[in-house]
A protein has these predicted regions:
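Conserved Nudix-box catalytic region and its N-terminal flanking loop in Nudix hydrolases
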Residues: 14-53
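Active-site-adjacent beta-strand/loop module that shapes the phosphate/pyrophosphate-binding cleft
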Residues: 67-90, 100
Length: 117
């Protein structure tokens, strides 16, 4: 099972979602920013690293929002989703097709990766 972390980044009543690049698995679907936990990292350290690599931001990682195990055809992931806020930086599309800030009632307008639903 692959350990994965993601950030539910809140700002002014909205949260950030990111669109995966077309060339990657589950391309053009939306997700919460994050990635795989390396063996030497805590989940929080992995989330901070992934957000620096993918968005050029530093996070303030909060409490766990949700834990889920999802089986894709090609892998099984244990996803830990953390509440978070941006400490420094402005999100950049370094590894994503698009970034959106949405309200909770807008979530159904976006096609998400199944583990992020």
């Amino acid at each position: 099972m692959t350990e994965v972390v993601a950030a539910l980044i809140w700002d002014q009543g909205k949260f950030m979602i990111c669109q995966r690049p077309a060339h990657k698995a589950r391309g053009l679907l939306w997700e919460f920013v994050g990635g795989k936990v390396e063996p030497s990292e805590t989940k929080e350290q992995a989330l901070i690293r992934e957000c620096q690599e993918e968005l050029a931001i530093t996070l303030d990682v909060g409490e766990i929002f949700m834990d889920v195990i999802h089986k894709y055809p090609d892998l099984t992931v244990h996803l830990t989703l953390f509440n978070a806020s941006i400490q420094t930086g402005i999100p950049q599309k370094l590894e994503h097709n698009d970034i959106q800030w949405i309200a909770v009632n807008e979530i159904d307008q976006y096609a998400f990766c199944p583990a992020d639903e």
